[in-house]
């Protein structure tokens, strides 16, 4: 039970979980941006600029996109997107597994 953990350990666990979620968001957002480029909705430079702005607006440094885990998982997320560049519901479990096991 987390309540039994010391405050130091609780903070460390929270930090690890937050970092994982930030990487997950960045990887999925990057996959979405690349999908929009592939569809011709955005140019590559527009997609990069929009993604960087979105991340900064959330207080996330875009350098997270260079994280090896994000770089590895983002293309795999892209394969789970549907025609509208959103997560295809039939791939939701696979996406959750990527989040849990890869990031």
Mark where each language-model region is.
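Compact alpha-helical subdomains of small soluble proteins
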Residues: 44-103
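Short N-proximal segments of mature Sec-exported proteins
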Residues: 3-63
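Charged, low-complexity, intrinsically disordered terminal regions
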Residues: 1-12, 94-103
């Amino acid at each position: 039970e987390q309540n039994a953990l010391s405050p130091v350990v609780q903070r460390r666990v929270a930090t690890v979980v937050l970092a994982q979620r930030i990487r997950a968001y960045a990887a999925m957002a990057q996959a979405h941006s690349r999908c929009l480029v592939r569809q011709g909705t955005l140019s590559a430079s527009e997609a990069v600029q929009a993604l960087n702005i979105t991340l900064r607006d959330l207080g996330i440094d875009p350098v997270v996109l260079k994280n090896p885990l994000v770089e590895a998982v983002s293309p795999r997320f892209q394969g789970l997107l549907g025609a509208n560049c959103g997560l295809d519901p039939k791939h939701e479990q696979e996406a959750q597994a990527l989040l849990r096991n890869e990031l």
